[in-house]
Structure formats: structure tokens, C-alpha cells
Amino acid sequence: MERTYINEVQKEIGSTVKVQGFIENLRNSKYMAFIVLKDITGKLQITVEKEDHPELVDTIDKLTPDSVITVTGKVMENDYVKMGGIEMIPESIEIESIADALPIVRKEIAATKKKKAVERSSIDQRIDYRWIDLRTDENQLMFKAQSCFVNAMRQFLLERSFIEIHTPKLIAAASESGSEVFKVDYFDRNAYLAQSPQFYKQMAMAAGFERIFETGPVFRAEKSYTNKHSTEFSGFDLEFSYITSYKDVMKMEEELLTAGLKAVKEQYGEQIKELFGLEVVVPTTPFPVVKLADLYKGLEEEFGYTVDESEKGDLTTEAERLSYDWVKKHYGHEFLFITDYSAEKRAFYHMRDENGVPQGYVLIRRGVEITTGAQREHRYDVLKKQAEEKGLADDVKFYLEFFQYGCPPHGGFGLGIDRLTMLLCGQSIKDAEFLFRGPNRLTP
């Protein structure tokens, strides 16, 4: 008999089916046993009257929470059952795997008259046993929503003639500078783990691909211990040619994100609200835009936030956080584009205007940076000069060659998929990554 997913059993009332999954809850009394079985699609109550099924008693007595079983039985309607008014009366129960007592507490357990409250294990303890922690409804919903988000963005781009590519993660030179990369031995020389696919995205533009995107790992050798930083994360990058301004890039990104959020809201919005207490907001377009200097001025006037003049060329962590209060007040929006950063704080490959202002932006959502985007410098002589200013000309010699033999104007951006997920469900980056990597975390 083929397996039936639990979300399909309501179509099989009165029929005998086979279901498989983890035991989420087990109540085993003298005369009755109730098993809540969970698979990736839902939950089903298995109801056993022991007098009617004495052959199942020995098997049931061996069961423990989180054990994996296969159950064959008849699907019945029962209005008293909370899980959709449906239960299964089993004919057979086969044990696939018995679970030992769990080493972590995945959810806080409230106190009762007979038992004290049990605190949830810390996030670091839960990451030690991440495969057990990931079985919760909240975690599985988070990754279902992430999958939906990424797939919607992928479809949006494919419908607009983008090509998906996959670039190397072992590279010969750092794409920004040598300070934030992991160095690895590569036979007789050094290599680096890519901190972005930037160089190769632009190589695709020089190759005439015109429109490309990529999803893949990104590595940052930063000793950051915040709830939004990690040393390895999943990136969603794109690049496209024949733009006239970085504003074309901003327009593409806001349309892309809107499509992704719309898909998530339609498929998982109600569940996210139920489990995380957050509304999935599909944003209006265009997104608000502010120059960095104007944002600092607004933050000072409205929130009394000031920074030293030397820091005003970049966005400080506190200004990043306060930007959400500012954009909510003025625009009622979750997103904010910030432009006109100092050239000193931007990558050498960002195009600059006649005043030396980088033609790029940062996108903030709910006070957290999720994107850096820009029009790239495609003119070889100008690009070489900007690389020399940063002291990188020798390190990026191979990259500069991409622009010696013709290259169209182009631009693009990179999104952090894990940060998007984190903000979607109101969790930390440690929760939002399948397996978190940080300065103190390299396992499991």
C-alpha cells in the first residue's frame, strides 16, 4: 500500500490508508491509547481501544514521543477530535525507530497543579540537537515559507528572461578586501571562500547573458555576535544589463520582493500569524527612498539621535534600527531605500556620479539591512582607477579583464535569504538558518 500524506486523509473517510511520521504526543492508559502522528503536511490522531485491538498493546507500550511509526488503518469522522474532526482506527502499527528521551526542551511547558513549569532550552542548546528542534511546527513553517519566498522570486525572474547560474565558491581573490574572507589551502597556493558571487555575476554581463540570478552560500569571516549576523548564509543575487540608473535596480528589487511576499501571504500568511503572531505585509510600491544625510538629519530632529561627522558616510547600527521608526512615521512602510553613501564606504566597483557619489543603495526592512545594490562601473579605465584607490588593482587583475573587451552598463544586488526569513517570522538568525554558523559555532 502506498503512503498517504496526512493532509490528504480527509479525502479517504471510510477507507483504509497507510500513514507515516513522528509521534508528537502519546497518551497511553489502561483501556485507551491516543497517538498524535505528525508528518511534514499535518497531524492525525490515532485512536486505539485496547480491548478491540489486543494485538497492538505490546507495540504501543514500547512507543515513546518522537518515535517514528507506520500506521495502517481506517479513516473515520469524529466531531470530538480537535484535528479536523478526523481520526484513524489502526489495524497495524509498525515501529520504524524508537526515540530515546529527548536531550532538549523544544517548547516551554506551563506549570500545572501537579507539575512545575519547564523552561525551553536555550537556542544554543537546541542547535546542538538541531535535527530534533527542527521538528517543531514553528521551524517547519519557517522553512516552508522560505521555500515559497525563494521559489516565487525565482519564478518572477524566469518569467522576465533571467538565467539561473551557479558560480564558484572557491576564488583566487577576495571580492571586496581581504579582511572578511576565509583563507583555505588550495594545493600549492591560497584560495578564499567567496563572500559574494559579485565578480562572476559581472562576468556574466560581459559574456552577454544580460540577466542572471543565483542562489547559493555566502561566507563572511566577521566576528559578529548579533542576532542578525552569521559566517555562512544563503544569498539570492541578481545582475542585469542595459540599465540607465541604479533606480532601475531598485525598481526590480521592490517588484521582486513584492512578488515573493505576496506568494508567502497567500500560502502561509494565516499560519504565520497563528504561530508567530506576525502579519505578512505585502508592500506597496514604490518603496520610500531617502538620502543618507537626510535620514541622519531626520533621526536627529525626531529622535535626538546624533553621530560624529566622521561616521555619517555610512549607516550606523543604531541608525539602521531607528530607520524603521522613521519610515513607519513618514510612510507607514516596512521598507526603506537609503542612497548617497560615502565612496569610502562603498565597494570600488560601484559607479559614481560626477560628484563622486556612489550610484547605489542599501535596502532596510523593519530596521534591518537586507540588501546592498548598485549600478556597477563597467568602463575599464574608470574601474581600474577606483580599484587602485582602494589598493586592490593587483588582487583583482583577473576581474578587471572582464571589462577590457566590451561590457554593457549593468547593475544588481544581493539579498540575504536567512535575514528575509528571520524578519518574516520574527526570529533570530540562529532560528532562521537551517544550521547556523558563527564565530563560535561550527557543528553540527
What are these regions (language model features)?
Residues 2-243, 435:
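Class II aminoacyl-tRNA synthetase-like tRNA-binding/catalytic domains
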Residues 109, 269-271, 419:
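Juxtamembrane/interface motifs at transmembrane-helix termini
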Residues 49, 53, 78, 121, ...:
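Serine/threonine-rich low-complexity intrinsically disordered regions
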Residues 259-273:
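Flexible helix-coil linker/hinge segments at domain or subdomain boundaries
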Residues 180-262, 285-444:
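A translation/RNA-centric and nucleic-acid-associated enzymatic feature enriched
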Residues 271-285:
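Short, highly charged C-terminal tails/helix-capping segments
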